[in-house]
Amino acid sequence: MNIVITGGAGFLGQRLAKALLHGSCPLAFDTLILADITPPPAPQPDARLQCLALDLSQPGAAERLIDADCGVLFHLAAIVSSHAESDFDLGMQVNFDATRQLLEAARHRAPGMKFIFTSSLAVFGGELPPVIDDRCAVTPQSSYGAQKAMCELLINDYARKGFVDGRVLRLPTISVRPGKPNKAASSFASGIIREPLHGKQAVCPVDAELALWLSSPAAVVSNFIHAATLPASAFGALRTLNLPGISVRVREMLEALRAVAGDAVAARVRFEPDAAINRIVAGWPGEFDTRRAQQLGFTADESFEQAIRTFIRDDMPQGGG
């Protein structure tokens, strides 16, 4: 049995691959294929690993990835929120068209395979109830959110028809990400923690009282793998789940940073409002009812302080400051 990760060169793809290759992983497989538009690095030496440079928007790309031996696909590849908003055509090609091609390849070449899709809080926007659950209607207010919402509906229908065993995971905003800022509207949610810990200044473009639904990378990767271990019957007819997270205001994030790293580190963050970013992020819900996911065994961080300490432990070997 083969496992495929699209977006395999990205931060989450690399973390997921490393976790899958670890001896404690509950998933047994023969080959792990990492695919991305740039050649994915091997997270560690392993004879089971294959790394492919592949543009999923090109004809035939999906068929190169999926054959009869493919048992699980983690579809992580995407054009992120602000980039998809500024380049509509590219967002549609990568976020929607490529997903449909992967679904078609799975339907015809590996029917019934587990198709695990990473969706987003951006499927929600506008006027929303105070707390969101799995059955709230999607109301995207951005091109990225619309593309993700269309994919959710398509995967649910492919699962209903028995073409694939679809599992849609709506990810919280991930914080704290290592590395450099990207074009996602939510990039600041890691930047206002990561940069000060590295001794750099950081800009927060949104209001201090804005509530975010957050998860650490470690919790998200653990939930990815858990999603692949569950039987199809666990999901029932509704194949979309809001993953557990923690609701934290930006002000509380900075208070947690201060508690972990001290006043001098927290003082490296300044507020410079960006109306476009604030509009996008403020449209995302800040609180979810994830009882269904929790009953299925998905988990969240204990606190945002814990998420910061985990980042320092895993991604800053010399410690923060």
Summary of predicted features, one role per range:
Residues 3-24:
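N-terminal Rossmann NAD(P)H-binding glycine-rich loop of SDR-like oxidoreductase domains
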Residues 126-128, 141-167:
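Active-site Tyr-X1-5-Lys
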